[in-house]
From Swiss-Prot:
GO terms for biological process: ribosomal small subunit assembly; translation. This is Ribosome maturation factor RimP. GO terms for cellular component: cytosol. Keywords: Cytoplasm, Ribosome biogenesis.
Length: 208
């Protein structure tokens, strides 16, 4: 049964508590979420390597497991979360979500899907194309050769699109093709639940 009440605690204090742990592993926090799943509450940390130059964040499954172990130890000591919960640590994945203006700027030139809360000037609500430079407070996407700019506030969700580089046949030019669905599934490694009083651990690495 899904939990019916939400735990009351300061997620900011959790963020502050885990920051030194992440720094000791040479990773930074991309996102921190407290969510309800069928198995109960989950504290989900998304991490990446400092100065990572790839969309996946440069972290491995082993990195996620190591960070999960040490974060779990700190949270046990600090006792900041009153609920039983699962702890999940993952990389952003090659189809990473774009949440901030800085992330849009970081991945200029990459292909992305941008869902809009309100239609773009041409009526579209889903833009897929190359991310372009845009004035502050806007997002610009090159869609079928046309530049479409929308207010950043109108972006409901945005993700990078992972594209495989196709090997050209003789007489053909090299290009890119979208990854097939079978190659896009998230890979998740789950550890056995710990005997601790409040949480089980999951270290996960999103691959595309």
């Amino acid at each position: 049964m899904e939990p019916s009440t939400r735990a009351v605690f300061d997620l900011g204090r959790v963020r502050d508590a885990v920051a030194p742990v992440l720094a000791s592993h040479g990773v930074t926090l991309v996102d921190l979420e407290w969510i309800t799943e069928r198995a109960g509450w989950t504290l989900r940390l998304t991490i990446e390597r400092e100065n990572a130059d790839d969309a996946g964040g440069g972290v491995t499954l082993e990195d996620c497991a190591d960070v999960s172990r040490d974060v779990s130890s700190v949270l046990d000591v600090e006792d900041l979360i009153p609920n039983h919960y699962n702890l999940e640590v993952s990389s952003p994945g090659l189809d990473r979500r774009l949440r901030t203006a800085a992330e849009f700027a970081r991945f200029l030139g990459r292909t992305a899907k941008v869902k809009l809360a309100r239609p773009a000037p041409d009526g579209q609500r889903l833009l897929r194309g190359e991310l372009l430079e845009a004035p502050e407070g806007q997002v610009a996407v090159l869609v079928d050769g046309k530049r479409i700019a929308v207010p950043f506030a109108d972006v409901a969700e945005a993700r990078l699109v992972f594209e495989l580089t196709a090997q050209p046949k003789k007489g053909q030019r090299q290009g890119k093709e979208p990854a097939k669905e079978s190659g896009q599934k998230k890979q998740l490694a789950e550890a056995a639940p710990r005997s601790g009083s409040k949480r089980s651990e999951r270290g996960s690495e999103k691959r595309k």
